[in-house]
Amino acid sequence: MATLLFLVYLAFTLTVLYRRLNPLIWEIGSAIYLLIATFFVGMHWLPGILIWLVVIGTVIVLRVDAVRDAISDFLFARLGNSIPKLSKTEEEALNAGDTWLEKDIFTGSPDWERLANISTVLTAEEQAFVDNETQTLCDMLDEWKISQASDLSDEVWNYIKENGFFGLVIPKEYGGKGFSARAHSDIVMKIASRSGVAAVTVMVPNSLGPGELLTHYGTEEQKAQYLPNLAKGLDIPCFALTEPGAGSDATSIQSEAIVLKKKVGDKEILGLNVSLNKRWITLAPVATLIGLAVNLKDPQGLLKGEGEEGITCLLIPRDTENLEIGNRHLPASQPFMNGTIRGKDIFVPISTIIGGQKNAGHGWQMLVECLSIGRSISLPALGAASSTIAYLTTGAFSRIRRQFNTEIGQFEGVEEKLAEIAGLNYLANATRLLTVAAVNEHKKPSVASAMTKYFNTEFGRITINNAMDVHAGRAVVVGPRNYLTSCYLGIPVSITVEGANIMSRNLLIFGQGSMACHPFVRDEFYAVSRDDKMAFRQLIWKHIYYFMHNFAKGLCSGWTAGLLINAPRSALKREYQRLARLSHAYAWLADLSLIYLGGDLKRKERLSARLADGMSYLYMAMASLRYYQQNEEHEDQKLHAKWAVTYCFYQAQKAMLSFCRNFPSKPLGFLVRVLLFPFGQTMHYPGDRLDHHLAQLMMRNNHYRDGIKQSIYLSGDAKQPIDKMEHALQLLINHGDLYRKIKDLKRFKFDALKEQLAIKVGKGELTQQEMDTLIAVEKARWDAIQVDEFSFESMKKKSFASVTDMLPNPLD
């Protein structure tokens, strides 16, 4: 009886914490329990004493201010010795940007209503630009010719400039398009599906660069001077940040600007003496307006309090004296314009600082905030484009290509690759749109953008690798027919730029997330830094109650598998519950790690990476549920969403369990694992049955497939590489009844097909029209699986003219 009563009391205590009820309710309930247990039930004296001590001690802490102050002062002193010392640039990076729905994950409180109300819809003007100007640009592009010429054609360059592709995000009052983040993302994605080189060329001026920096931070004079020319393409911008000694650690740049006065003509001008050595700068070889990050120094104190020393952003023209620019890099054989900028003793006026002298020393925060916008849009769109191409072409190829008298998509090994392509593509598109929605709401989602950039580019890598595996020889022979090699070569570039993925996962995502998303940590950090005990006293007790609240949620959800959690009415209701259940566990685990490890988390990168994985996968699961919610009337969308969220739950739980196993305190790690995940790894990788259904779905028309076809470039011309595959697939789908009618057709070889079909016509098994139709379909199938070949002489001359189209078709 005593044990049962104790369990009831424990459930009551957890309910008070879970529901955040008034502590007085717990105190009254505890008093009633202790009286009954002690005087009426006959509780054993030893546990009785322990429970009395715990309850009395807790009440004293809750009610006696002097005790609370003593505890908080003790914690204040301990934290003062353990918090990491941050440099100015680290502090600016951690404080830059806004939070988005990742905060719901971090705090264990997903808001389903808020999620359901998020919308990103193109305006009529934006849709028209995607359908017309962007389509026309894609018509003009030929990735094979671009690779041979190592540049876009003059015609393409002029079209990009004249039609405002460099001014997509510049406000209309300065001659730009003023498009939304969704339009920007859709435009980049469509171009990327045709040419990665062209996509990079368009996306960089609209991402981290002079246009974005001027729009947000420029003076009115700077905006009026530069933005109209940028919008019209009269100026081509670039931004020079990285250096030989400063890549991911961009805060350690050595390029410097010394504040000094110099006599120019009859006037003494306050200016900067700039020396720089930059590399990996996209558009640098052709740029006419150069944005530049330098370490500003003021040894003579000439700034006089207006601005300060530190990283500063400048804007200088190409023809500035002593500036060396024009040399090119060739990143992964992708011939977009990328190169070096050097110079020494370059004098520029102080007015070249973006935003004027007052912004001296504030460049890093400007860069991080603008980077969070670009990382939300450009690179996620590239990753989504790659995985979408993988989805459409690999599904089609698996239906078109036959081996061992069977469509290769029927082999289980191929099905496994297909399902992963489909599920990860669904995740990439869903995550892209959810993060873009934050920018549409004028937020600068630094954490969400880092997660989206990391995982969309990683998913691009996985799906393209899978596509290469399935296509096999069809993918490895380069030429104008090959639609995968360019994506494959471009993947390392997207993985590396705007924050190398290794650094983002191990340092940035959870590092920024803990400061931005936790309701108390940032304020506690500053209270300790400023020696503000009074502020800390108020914060720490709110934090402790928050910690206990999350503990109760994590414990209850873990032991009930989340079955009691409220969730929206949906065919995927159980997935909503699982997401909430895992977010409850994550919130307490993240908080515990911050409390126990403190500043050591900055050094324990692999633990930080696992916490980053947990938050990221749950964020992507949330994105997938939202994406499904908008299309839930279609059964094929459910299959895609089911695979995507199942994958995310598996990876998130795996990351958290791995975190517990590798926790520095083994006993505490074990205890946490038992409390939060008493049944171990209950979330599993998508099963074979789901893989099979999804793979088979990829090889035929479905609602999701039809939707993503609208997001990439298709010309309607069966001579174009991707259209060639799509044309053959649609013929196979539309005439599937004929293949079912002639069941042994798959055993026919191309060379003997006409003869064998003629025999069947003679027997009355086929009509002549049906025979002609089948031959037309098989001719398209033959054409789709051909690869490029080149004459020996053209290879020798490096002209690389494919002769495949001139070769006879065995069905002619």
Located regions from the model:
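Flexible, small-/acidic-enriched active-site or ligand-binding loops
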Residues: 321-347
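C-terminal helix-coil-helix/basic helical segment that borders enzyme active sites and/or dimer interfaces
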Residues: 425-455, 464-476, 598, 620-653, ...
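C-terminal substrate/ligand-recognition segments
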Residues: 575, 579-582, 605-621
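Gly/Pro-rich turn-and-neighbor structural signature
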Residues: 120-135, 141-163, 214-263, 273, ...
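A glycine-rich, basic-preceded beta-loop-alpha segment at the flavin cofactor/substrate interface
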Residues: 342-375, 392-409, 550-573, 585-602
